[in-house]
Amino acid sequence: MATASLRYYTYDANNQAPERLLGIENVENIDEMLIPLNEKNTPIFITKAFTGIACKRWRVEFVLGIEKNIWGVWLSEKDISKDVYLSQTMKKRSIAHAGGIVKRGCIVIVEFGHIYLTLNFSNGLSDSSHYPCYHQSGEMHKRRPAIVVSADKRGVKVVPITSQEPDGHLFNRAIFELESASTTYISEFKRDKPCFALCEMIQTVSPTRILPPEAKDMKSSDRKFRRDESYYRKLTTNDLHALEEGLLAAVGLAALRKKNETLLGERDRLKNTLDEQEQVLASTSHALEQTRTLHDDQKKRYEVLSQLYLASSGHTSLQSIEAEVSEYL
């Protein structure tokens, strides 16, 4: 029966004390397994509960083959004492769903998870493309800032943010660069690097993955960076507008919106024309009513005068008076 093992050790670059064995995972009759390494060699964090160890969140420092079928993973403790996830805040406040706390435009931090490599005990390392139940290359990964789009009982829709300038972002309306006013005094953003919102990568995440950004508390006297559970950090007005445009572009509705705006403009123009015509009609109707009143008045006057003239003119009927009037006209 073939056996392989993964051994976990402590690592501290500032401490020359011998490394400590934290735990061992043994596998039997298994040819390969996923290990916390990635092709880009970016930092990876794992959650592991070792017997007798209080820390459960670790940073992977490096992974090495020790001998045949034995690999070592060296870890350093990650301080999560200040981390408070949205799910915890919801529980404390007895709020049923995330929408009661985070709103559209809120800046949050999301644990998207990591992309692992596959360790084959005979052939070595390879990508994890044949493990579709895990994160794959090209998918959003690692802890990063994001923007809340909406939230309900099913989860929170977010747009991830990256500091890596996306290819062709100047021509891609689904990507926009954030204003510095949106990101200032948030430790997860670097001052000297621009930040881009990737609206085309919108996705739904669980509240258990979300925590508030570590932002400077301008209301306190010490103005320290802390994770404020009120989630008060939001996009600027301009960035909110850019978010709306980016989301429309991401689902192919930017052109439809432009057409809709054109149609709305034409509707408003026609409405204004109709209002003007209604005013003209109202004015004409008023003038017509005045003319009709004047006509009725003149008609009554003519009838009275005709009767008076009939008595003294020698005419025997109104018809003969009409004939006389017609001769004068």
Label every PLM stretch briefly:
Residues M90-K92, S122-N123, H135-S137:
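Active-site substrate-binding loop(s) of clan PA
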Residues H114, P160-T162, Q203:
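A mature extracytoplasmic/lumenal domain signature
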Residues I109, V159, L198-E200:
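Residues in well-ordered beta-strands of folded domains
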